[in-house]
Curated annotation (Swiss-Prot):
One of its GO terms (cellular component) is respiratory chain complex I. Core subunit of the mitochondrial membrane respiratory chain NADH dehydrogenase (Complex I) which catalyzes electron transfer from NADH through the respiratory chain, using ubiquinone as an electron acceptor. Part of the enzyme membrane arm which is embedded in the lipid bilayer and involved in proton translocation. Keywords: Electron transport, Membrane, Mitochondrion, Mitochondrion inner membrane, NAD, Respiratory chain, Translocase, Transmembrane, Transmembrane helix, Transport, Ubiquinone. Gene3D superfamilies: 1.10.287.3510. It catalyses: a ubiquinone + NADH + 5 H(+)(in) = a ubiquinol + NAD(+) + 4 H(+)(out). GO terms for biological process: ATP synthesis coupled electron transport. Coiled coil: none annotated. It is found in: Mitochondrion inner membrane. The chain crosses the membrane at residues 1-21, 26-46, 61-81. This is NADH-ubiquinone oxidoreductase chain 4L. It comes from the Eukaryota. Pfam families: Oxidored_q2.
Length: 98
């Protein structure tokens, strides 16, 4: 496995561990999720370029669309929680109460 792929997998693992460690704050969780999506995008792009398979060229773009949707929903949820409770603790977030 080339060193670039190893570094990208290490970045994904670090972001995943960051999500597990800093799961009490919503902003930290969102930043770690964005790091995971960025490393997945780079890994998907490199894999697509190395395969030379024309049908997989849309996969990184589709991944970016999902990452943008995830970021928009996450930021909307962050604004809603911080306006309601004044802090971004995930413990305050209970989706069963509307």
């Amino acid at each position: 496995m080339p060193s670039i792929s190893t570094n990208i997998i290490l970045a994904f693992t670090t972001a995943l561990l960051g999500t597990l460690i800093y799961r009490s704050h919503l902003m930290s969780s969102l930043l770690c999720l964005e790091g995971m999506m960025l490393s997945m995008f780079i890994l998907t792009s490199l894999t697509t370029l190395n395969l030379h398979f024309s049908l997989t060229t849309m996969a990184p773009i589709i991944l970016l669309v999902f990452a943008a949707c995830e970021a928009a929903i996450g930021l909307a949820l962050l604004v809603m929680v911080s306006n309601t409770y004044g802090m971004d603790y995930i413990q305050n977030l209970n989706l069963l109460q509307c």
